[in-house]
UniProtKB/Swiss-Prot annotation:
Protein name: Glutamate--tRNA ligase 1
Record-linked HAMAP family: Glu_tRNA_synth_type1
Cellular compartment(s): Cytoplasm
GO BP annotations, alphabetical order: glutamyl-tRNA aminoacylation
One CC-aspect GO term: cytoplasm
A Pfam family annotated for this UniProt entry: tRNA-synt_1c
Organism: Paramagnetospirillum magneticum (strain ATCC 700264 / AMB-1) (Magnetospirillum magneticum)
Gene (UniProt): gltX1
Length: 444
């Protein structure tokens, strides 16, 4: 295989969700597995809905995932290239002017459906006489431009779906240019894919019906169409769709929870494939395992509980250096991290344990007489991981308590929690003075 060139082409009209992230990830894994290039293209020709803050969010999300790109392009900077391609198509007769209003097209569609006919555009505009066109333009109508499809079967060998085909006669001629002169998705996308040398278009299966017109458009512009891979769309755990505008499963929300990016990459890379879902620590590992023949056509479901399990496994082996920046806790050190790490389900939970160790807490006193007696037996001097065992043995001998009756009241008084990290690691972090005050029932 020659080195592939792929592209991820989001529109900056909303936040990326995990479905978008999966498409971006699989594009990059495929390209890098074969020594190729990954292009990030922002499809921002919709000036009304595209927003710079969404564009920045896309870049931030991809950086967070580690999906660095080899080239960044913005369609809003390439309008001249699209206009030149449109002019070529007009000269060759492959696009034609249409003057129907949206209301007229909708009425025509309803009539077709009422007659049991497919709602395919009937090319009425091609039958307009010059005087009719002049009259419509005198009324102030400005044409939109449709691409004239060849009424033939279009075939391609899809990397995921296998041999695929669609007949041009089953589709309306797609509108390439709006009445205001702005471009819809199809023409800019094909022009960019040609000029950037894209060899493989990897995207969701909601684009399958776009493929036949796009293949014909590649050919009309004198180019060989790239290969296509259409992935089943990712859904939520119960089968609901994901929406970037609603923020459903948005990467922004996931990042805020402290999720490790490789937990998400490990999950998204394997969803819909025959590989078992398991932790991978680097993108290079995922690249080495990537192959199209592992992917099927079943609907993959994104389960946040599965993501959390992967994240917890990664977190429980992560060094302090790996999490320092993500912790966001001033003063936190390796001793603290190693103490709390085994008991965390989410990285954000570490902040609460930092507060327990370093900030004032109202103790929960189950048996004041017992905890005061235990306070009197706290050892002096430097504390380490052996202190807890030595101290509780002394308390046991002095009070006769053992098991839960011994340990539970001490944990409640020292941490205010029923459960948590081992107290042999927490006690040195809490310190002598704070521990004694809490055992005495004082806020400390």
């Amino acid at each position: 295989m020659t080195s592939p060139v792929v592209r991820f082409a989001p529109s900056p009209t909303g936040l990326l969700h995990v479905g978008n992230a999966r498409v971006a990830l699989l594009n990059r894994l495929f390209a890098k597995a074969h020594g190729g290039s990954f292009i990030l293209r922002l499809d921002d020709t919709d000036l009304e809905r595209s927003r710079p803050e969404f564009a920045e969010a896309i870049l931030d999300d991809l950086r967070w995932l580690g999906l660095d790109w080899d080239r960044l392009e913005r369609q809003s900077a390439r309008l001249d290239a699209y206009a030149a391609a449109a002019e070529r198509l007009k000269v060759s007769g492959r696009v034609y002017a249409c003057y129907e209003t949206p209301d007229e097209l909708e009425l025509r569609r309803k009539v077709q459906l009422g007659r049991g006919l497919p709602p395919v555009y009937d090319r009425a505009a091609l039958k307009l006489a010059p005087d009719e066109i002049a009259r419509l333009e005198a009324e102030g109508r400005r044409p939109h431009w449709r691409f004239k499809l060849e009424l033939e079967d279009v075939r391609w060998d899809d990397c995921v779906r296998g041999p695929s085909h669609y007949h041009g006669g089953n589709l309306s001629d797609p509108v390439l240019i709006r009445g205001d002169g702005s471009f819809l998705y199809t023409l800019p996308s094909v022009v960019d894919d040609i000029e950037f040398g894209v060899t493989h278009i990897i995207r969701g299966e909601d684009h399958v019906t776009n493929t036949a017109p796009q293949i014909q458009l590649f050919q009309a512009l004198g180019a060989v169409p790239p290969a296509f891979a259409h992935l089943p769309l990712l859904t939520g755990a119960t089968g609901e769709g994901l929406s970037k505008r609603l923020g459903s499963g948005s990467l922004k929300d996931l990042r805020a929870t402290g999720i490790h990016p490789m937990a998400l990459n490990s999950l998204l890379a394997k969803l819909g494939s025959s590989d078992a879902i398991d932790i991978r620590h680097t993108l290079a590992e995922l690249e080495a395992e990537f192959a199209w023949d592992k992917f099927g056509r079943g609907t993959p479901k994104f389960d946040s509980a599965e993501l959390e399990r992967l994240d917890a496994r990664l977190m429980h082996t992560a060094s302090f250096a790996e999490v320092r920046d993500r912790l966001g806790i001033d003063g936190a050190d390796e001793e603290f991290w190693l103490a709390v790490r085994p008991n965390l389900n989410h990285l954000a939970e570490a902040e609460a344990w930092w507060a327990i160790c370093r900030q004032d807490l109202t103790p929960v006193i189950e048996d004041g007489e017992f905890t005061r007696a235990a306070a009197a037996l706290l050892p002096d001097g430097a504390w380490d991981h052996a202190t807890w065992g030595a101290w509780t043995e002394t308390v046991k001998q002095a009070t006769g308590r053992k098991g839960k009756a011994l340990f539970h009241p001490l944990r409640l008084a020292l941490t205010g929690r029923e459960n948590g990290p081992e107290l042999k690691t927490l006690l040195p972090l809490i310190g002598h003075d704070r521990a004694r005050a809490r055992l005495m029932g004082e806020i400390a």
